[in-house]
């Protein structure tokens, strides 16, 4: 039987560079299956761990701590004929114009000309979810800045990953099989864009709180304070053991 895990490349908020930009990789038997988000530090950590660029990538939203590595990834993919156009980029359909505006629309992506940013990728837009390597991944909208601009991802039976979000009890109650570990955005204090631990304890039932594994916090000290509250707090380099996917 395959061994499944979620490897955390980084767990920090946008200002917590020392914790790495928030990103994780679904692994099967230690090999990467799907990278989630591609901040600058996340791409560096990915290359250090796996020795090659990702072959599959899902983006939760387009804030720069989650997409700043995309220009560098383009260069690495495009100039390797064996990888050019081979990286599957799974994009919620609503994010396609934002990736275009934020990353792909820079004039003259290569000085030599004759190249489109998207030539390096195999783009797979989706709404409710997508198939990858025979697995169905659920995709769901979260609460982060403007509506329709941020999304989470779940592999039924294995994990839920919220991406950046405020509390979403009504969403998490209907995603997955109901017993997966939930990697959840959580700082020591909340704000209009991100969850704080008091927000989660106020809005989530005890059974849901028991499934949380916290990431996207502001400092090592904040992480320690969250642990004192009794929650698992992920660190860069951690592996979260997963149950095998339960597919349709």
Q: In which residue ranges do the predicted regions lie?
A:
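Cap/insert and terminal regions of metallo-dependent hydrolase folds
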Residues: 167-248
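Active-site neighborhood of divalent metal-dependent phosphoester bond hydrolases
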Residues: 82-87, 94-123
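A short helix-to-beta-strand connector/capping loop
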Residues: 2-4, 85, 113-122, 133-135, ...
